[in-house]
Amino acid sequence: MESVEEQPHQALLVIAHPGHELRLYGWLRKVRPLIAILTDGSGSTGISRIDLSRDLCESLGGEIVVPGRFVEPDFYSLILRGETAPFLAFAQELAHIIDERSVDVVVCDSVEGYHPAHDFCLPLTRAALALSASASSRGVRHLEYRVVGQPRTVNDADARWPVELDDATFSEKIRRSRRYAEASGSVLAQEVAYMFDTYGEDAFRHEVLQRAGSEQPRLYDGMRYFEMRGEEQVRAGRYRSVLRYTEHLQPVEAALCARS
């Protein structure tokens, strides 16, 4: 079975928000990928997390090549308005990186239904690979990882590229994850605490990459979690409208696919 022990010549990690790289801490330390970040992670606080991620990634040997293409609220506005040109331009930028840096593995956030930006990374990277002049001929692999789900298990046991962290790296990962979350002063701190409480810290000793598209979004009464959460925020008066998958995100994904 193929393993990430067979290190790629050059990997590209595409993530929705700064901080996601913590999920692949051991892999990042081993592979030292290029990293492209979709948004700046500012969310409702207005405070970017890019500098936190730059310090972390550079200390592990990674290189941030796209430090947050969109201010996070702007990303949602573009999706709600159905604008595709900025995302196609970003896909073309990623394609250029794949070609110029001879990337042979692209890794992205999986589609879990938790957050629209997370779910957008898969179609974005698919478009980038389709637009690349060399990805097909060079056999560039396309992999994904879970951002919020149980990190240890995947749907298909035959589609696993596991990394098992040694004690020192595991302790370092937990310590730096907590430190990053505290420094961010955002909802990320709550999410990190929730994941450690839910899955247990030891689950994060395991990092699993799987073939892109293996994951399926969890649905609640036919809705992705971010739609349900959006409805709650509208009722609370925090949002004016709900970003929905079929109405907003899917058409932008389809346009990306059609143009690439």
Segments and roles (model prediction):
Residues M1-L13, P86-S260:
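Metal-dependent de-N-acetylase/amidase catalytic core
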Residues M1-R101, R126, A130-S137:
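Active-site rim/loop-helix segments in enzyme catalytic domains that contact anionic ligands
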